[in-house]
Each structure stands twice: as C-alpha cells, then as structure tokens.
C-alpha cells in the first residue's frame, strides 16, 4: 500500500491546503492519487474540506465516511448530530478500499493526531498503525510550534509509526525572528518537506498548480508510491 496520513499539530494549521498541494503535485507528476477525509465537521457552514481539495488540486477521487454539521471536535459533533463515530474497522476499511497498487492515497485527519475520530477513543495514530502508513505532520511557524511538534513526533515514535517529515502550513510573507529561528529548529526535528505561503488556499487553479509543483521535491513525492 502507498498510504500517507496527513496530520497537524492543531486545528486550522493548514492540513487541507497541504493535502491539496501534495495531491496536486502528484497529479501533475502523472501519479494516480486519491484523497480520504474520513471524518469532517463543520459542514453546515459549507466547510467541506474535500471540496476544497477538489477545487485546488483538480483531484476527483475523494472519499469520506462521516460528515457532521457543527464545527466541533468529531466526538462532540457526532453526539450533537445524534450519531456515533464510525468504528475502527469501518475507518480502516474505507482507506484500504481506496488504496491500490501504484496509487498514492492521502488520508487527512480531523484536528490533531490524538483527537478521537472513531468509536472507543480511536485516533488517527491508530489508523496509521493499522495501515502501516507513515505520517506527514503540518506545523505552524510561530511561537509554541516546537513543543507541539515534538509532542506529535514523540506520540508517533511511541507506537513505532514512521514520520515522513514536516510541512509548514502557512509561512508568513514577512517572517519575524521567531518564525525564522523556528524554521531552522523544525528542520532539526525532521525533514521540512515544504513551507506553503500564507493564503495559498485562495490562489487560482493555475497559480496553485505552479505553487504545488515548486513546493515539494518530485523525487520525494514519487518515492511515496511503493
């Protein structure tokens, strides 16, 4: 399987735009690519992450298992909708069914790595462990990011889940001392695969394609496909 799980050090960190950029790069490189977002919340306000991926990346093979209207953590959003979260088996089966030989399957989580997304406390880390998939972590550039990043990487290492590196989800146009120093420090924690500029999600299709091609190393992206 060629599954890459995309998580973040928090909510609103840029996971969806990073997922879209990586999917766009893979598509333009001629790779077969699919995107899964097993759990989505906040859809009542038109916040559909897979629709964002489709618009930005031009990828049509998109999959989700459960959508809840309120912009809350998955468990709270499910309960307020009178529903349960999916089972661990259902989440695993969704992703396994999408993946196939020669395909890059991107799986975007909801919130951070250890947020409950399945019944019984199942997290994105559990799914990565089940599927033997590496994890790409989207991080912030500002103050606090080093602690959050280390906690996420340690949580992965605790379960022997391989880290595929880091992506800075929103790099400011005028970075300050903290951001510049943090970028160097993040690179010591793991390979920084890309740093997407702030506002990347507002770009037009052509501009987003150009950004996606430039943002990631093509050899690394191709190497994700086993």
Curated annotation (Swiss-Prot):
Homodimer. This is ATP-dependent dethiobiotin synthetase BioD. One of its GO terms (molecular function) is ATP binding. Its cofactor is Mg(2+). It catalyses: (7R,8S)-7,8-diammoniononanoate + CO2 + ATP = (4R,5S)-dethiobiotin + ADP + phosphate + 3 H(+). It is an enzyme of class 6 (ligase). It is found in: Cytoplasm. Pfam families: AAA_26. Catalyzes a mechanistically unusual reaction, the ATP-dependent insertion of CO2 between the N7 and N8 nitrogen atoms of 7,8-diaminopelargonic acid (DAPA, also called 7,8-diammoniononanoate) to form a ureido ring. Its main location: cytoplasm. Mg(2+) binds at residues 16, 49, 108. It comes from Mycolicibacterium gilvum (strain PYR-GCK).
């Amino acid at each position: 399987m060629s599954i890459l799980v995309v998580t973040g050090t928090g909510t609103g960190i840029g996971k969806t735009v990073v997922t879209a950029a990586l999917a766009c790069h893979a598509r333009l490189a001629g790779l077969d690519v699919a995107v899964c977002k097993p759990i989505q919340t906040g859809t009542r306000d038109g916040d559909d992450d897979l629709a964002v991926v489709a618009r930005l990346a031009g990828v049509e093979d998109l999959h989700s298992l459960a959508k809840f209207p309120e912009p809350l953590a998955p468990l709270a959003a499910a309960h307020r909708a009178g529903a349960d979260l999916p089972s661990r088996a259902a989440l695993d089966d969704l992703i396994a069914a999408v993946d196939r030989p020669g395909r890059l399957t991107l799986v975007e989580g909801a919130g951070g790595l250890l947020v409950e997304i399945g019944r019984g406390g199942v997290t994105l880390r559990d799914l990565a462990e089940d599927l033997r998939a590496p994890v790409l972590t989207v991080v912030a550039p500002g103050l606090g990011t080093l602690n959050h990043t280390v906690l996420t990487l340690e949580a992965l290492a605790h379960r022997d889940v391989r880290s595929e590196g880091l992506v800075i989800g929103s790099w400011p146009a005028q970075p300050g001392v903290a951001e510049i120093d943090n970028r160097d420090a993040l690179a010591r924690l793991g390979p920084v695969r890309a740093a997407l500029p702030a506002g990347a999600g507002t770009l037009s299709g052509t501009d987003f394609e150009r950004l996606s091609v430039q943002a990631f190393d093509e050899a690394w992206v191709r190497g994700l496909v086993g």
